[in-house]
Swiss-Prot record:
It is an enzyme of class 7 (translocase). One of its GO terms (molecular function) is ATP hydrolysis activity. ATP binds at residues 34-41. Belongs to the ABC transporter superfamily. Vitamin B12 importer (TC 3.A.1.13.1) family. Its EC number is 7.6.2.8. Residues 1-236 form the ABC transporter domain. This is Vitamin B12 import ATP-binding protein BtuD. SMART domains: AAA. The lineage of its organism: Bacteria, Pseudomonadati, Pseudomonadota, Gammaproteobacteria, Enterobacterales. It comes from Photorhabdus laumondii subsp. laumondii (strain DSM 15139 / CIP 105565 / TT01) (Photorhabdus luminescens subsp. laumondii).
Length: 253
């Protein structure tokens, strides 16, 4: 992980995000953690080029604002927490929206991704008929399909806002495997979440946000300190070691 993919320099959004500076390296899995309202979604939307911001964001040494929306769609995929859809649109048609018109020989990758998330029987189902977990798996399949390296050589970055929402434990495990594979192929993932144990176990680097400010940035062991987490989340958070592993628990009065 020696190649810089993205650089953020004093990025801010009025009343939502304080000036923030950070680097994203190719192949990294970065988790953004922090309380509700700390700026996680705002930061991801800025990095996706969706939300106006002050400061500078460079993607592959080029200012993010210099990319057209079509160019950005080739380089990065963004999963927001909520998205409206056309209820009668079948799943297979929704997934096709994530593919560039010039791409060919995508069937193998589509089949592999659908198998990961067990979507085969839903391909002809209208998205409006899906459960919350099924819809989340469809959306995840779409963003992976958009930047999967074997069919999109320009695909580099996945920005995922709370991607584990509505997923059960086996689906989270499948997502983790797919993220790991994407990073091994040279992709980079920046995602937000609320599961401290999951982030401690899976992240290469953690950005800890509080009140719109980046209060810590580093490896999980460097960032996830009991006093720091307790202060940020305004709760008594303890590390509970079990053999060689660590588990984070919140103790409420």
């Amino acid at each position: 992980m020696t190649n810089q993919l993205m650089a953020l320099n004093q990025v801010s959004v009025r009343n939502r995000l304080m000036p923030l500076t950070a680097l994203v390296q190719q192949g990294e899995q970065i988790h953004i953690i922090g309380p509700n309202g700390s700026g996680k979604s705002t930061l991801l939307a800025c990095m996706a080029g969706i939300l106006p911001y002050s400061g500078a964001i460079d993607l592959q040494q080029k200012c993010l604002s210099q990319y057209s929306h079509c160019q950005l769609a080739r380089y990065r995929a963004w999963l927001s927490q909520q998205i409206s859809s056309v209820p009668i649109m079948p799943v297979f048609q929704y997934l096709q929206l994530h593919l560039a018109a010039h791409l060919v020989n995508c069937d193998g990758v589509l089949s592999e991704l659908c198998s990961f998330f067990k979507l085969g029987k839903f391909l002809e189902t209208p998205v409006g008929n899906l459960s919350g977990g099924e819809w989340q798996r469809v959306r995840l399949t779409g963003v992976f399909l958009q930047v999967w390296p074997s069919i999109n050589l320009e695909g580099k970055l996945l920005l995922l806002d709370e991607p584990t929402n509505n997923l059960d434990i086996t689906q989270v495990a499948a997502l983790d495997l797919l993220i790991k594979k994407f990073c091994e192929l040279g992709g980079t993932v920046v995602m937000s979440g609320h599961d401290l144990n999951h982030s401690y176990d899976k992240a290469d680097r953690i950005w800890l946000l509080a009140d719109g400010s980046l209060v810590a940035n580093g490896k999980p062991d460097e960032v996830m300190k009991e006093n720091t987490l307790s202060r940020v989340f305004a709760a008594d958070i303890k590390c509970v070691p079990e053999k060689t592993d660590k588990y984070w628990r919140v103790f409420l009065p």
